[in-house]
């Protein structure tokens, strides 16, 4: 990240997630603007079909993918199905999007300082009211089976704590935690499970205190211009894209980087 290296090929899971989130954000906004369920869904599916028609052919058509590769589940047909089924599953969603003078609280960019030299930034999918209580809603898509093993990874979790803090600080909304809306993409079906991650004020205080220690450690690495490997994290979340580079001798890593990656500096402060 510091040097701006990114893979030359497409990140299938990232692209699928961007398309899925974008479609649901658009659906939420259309519903707020007065479109009926069917009108909003028709518009979203049409726009998604257009967005996934690239260079004269469908993006990741199922017939073009190796069915033995689990990533083949992240295909155009399954994307469309998952959008439609999610919208139908939550047609009468008890989690209602909160609305402010600026409109519906969906796809919210946040940026706030935590001291004089550090800022936290990112995006929230949605802020909702559920049973008269405010929550952040985070939508996930996965090929994993949805059960306790899957949802346990989000509590405790850095992202869930950050989203809770961001809602409370940047949007002055004292949320109780995060609702995780997960979509399982499988052969022939998409399945949805809703789970809750609750955060108490004491937990948030602890997370902020711990964050200060991690940032202090990062300062030390900057001063030494050396970032040690954390090789216990190399295989998490589908595996780090740099595993193949880090497994090489330090003396030859640059050559492998240049052949498989390209430099593309990312500025998280730029609103997408």
Describe each region flagged by the PLM.
Residues 1-32, 107, 239-242:
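Nuclease catalytic cores
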Residues 22, 26, 81, 85, ...:
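Residue-level signal for well-ordered alpha-helical scaffold segments within enzymatic catalytic domains
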Residues 39-43, 73, 152-155, 164-272:
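Metal-dependent nuclease catalytic regions and adjoining charged, substrate-binding loops involved
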Residues 1, 133-140, 212-219:
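Active-site-adjacent bridging/hinge elements
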Residues 102-164, 168:
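Non-catalytic protein-protein interaction segments used by genome-maintenance enzymes to assemble
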Residues 12, 16, 75, 79, ...:
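Hydrophobic (often cysteine-bearing) scaffold residues that line and stabilize catalytic clefts
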Residues 7, 11-14, 150-154, 231:
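Short, solvent-exposed segments of well-ordered alpha helices
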Residues 23-106:
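A non-catalytic, helix-rich entry segment at domain boundaries
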